[in-house]
């Protein structure tokens, strides 16, 4: 259990690229001004419409704080393909940020 202030960040948008440079699925988040250099991101969780959760790892899945991605051939992410991401949760040094989104994969 994380003991931190949770903030819901409304109005964010996600640009999905399905043939990214680093990963098969890449997401760039806009409207979420997290200063990742001053406020370390410890982890990110993607939640889908059916309640499934997928944790992201630094370097492999998280770049520059708010750029996210994963490869379709990674067995861990195989079951997320075809689902809709409804929430992205950032665990950062100064709290937890919940971003309601609607990203169909």
Language model features with spans:
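Short, aromatic- and glycine-rich surface loops/edge beta-strands on solvent-exposed regions
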Residues: 44, 83-93
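Short, surface-exposed binding/anchoring microloops in extracellular/periplasmic proteins
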Residues: 11-46
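Solvent-exposed serine/threonine-rich low-complexity stretches and specific carbohydrate-binding patches
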Residues: 53-65, 104
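Aromatic sugar-binding surface patches on proteins
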Residues: 62-75
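Edge beta-strands of extracellular beta-sandwich domains
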Residues: 96-105
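Surface-exposed, short loops/turns at beta-strand junctions within beta-sandwich domains
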Residues: 76-84
């Amino acid at each position: 259990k994380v003991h931190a202030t949770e903030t819901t960040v409304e109005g964010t948008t996600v640009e999905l690229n399905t043939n990214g440079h680093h990963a098969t699925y890449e997401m760039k988040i806009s409207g979420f001004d997290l200063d990742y250099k001053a406020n370390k991101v410890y982890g990110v969780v993607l939640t889908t419409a059916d309640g499934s959760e997928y944790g992201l790892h630094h370097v492999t899945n998280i770049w520059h704080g708010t750029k996210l991605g994963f490869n379709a051939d990674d067995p861990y992410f195989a079951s997320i393909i075809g689902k809709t991401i409804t929430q992205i949760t950032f665990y950062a040094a100064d709290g937890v940020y919940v971003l309601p989104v609607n990203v169909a994969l």
